[in-house]
């Protein structure tokens, strides 16, 4: 298993309960596919460098995970179809 840094920006208009559900759901994608979340940091609401999907702010969440490439592929699939996520990135640690 490899370590990855995952970061996504959630829609700033989500209410706190839906945001907690989103964070739990995306963390669960990793753990249910045999990976583990080593660290999770909810950075909070920040200004975006440029407008994304008509949003000027976004709620940033960062995770350090240890997972197989298959688990990361499933995470990418889920995060790309989740409407509440306006941007995401996955980086293999060491690159």
Swiss-Prot record:
**Which GO terms of type biological process are on file?**
translation
Q: Which GO terms describe its molecular function?
A: small ribosomal subunit rRNA binding; structural constituent of ribosome
* UniProt superkingdom: Bacteria
Name the keywords, alphabetized: Ribonucleoprotein, Ribosomal protein, RNA-binding, rRNA-binding
InterPro entries under this entry? Ribosomal_bS6 (IPR000529), Ribosomal_bS6_CS (IPR020815), Ribosomal_bS6_sf (IPR035980), Ribosomal_S6_plastid/chlpt (IPR020814), Transl_elong_EF1B/ribsomal_bS6 (IPR014717)
In its UniProt entry, what is this protein called?
Small ribosomal subunit protein bS6
- Please state which protein family the record places this protein in: Belongs to the bacterial ribosomal protein bS6 family.
SUPFAM superfamilies for this protein = Ribosomal protein S6
| Coiled coil stretches, renumbered | none
Q: Name one GO cellular component term.
A: ribonucleoprotein complex
Its annotated function is as follows: Binds together with bS18 to 16S ribosomal RNA.
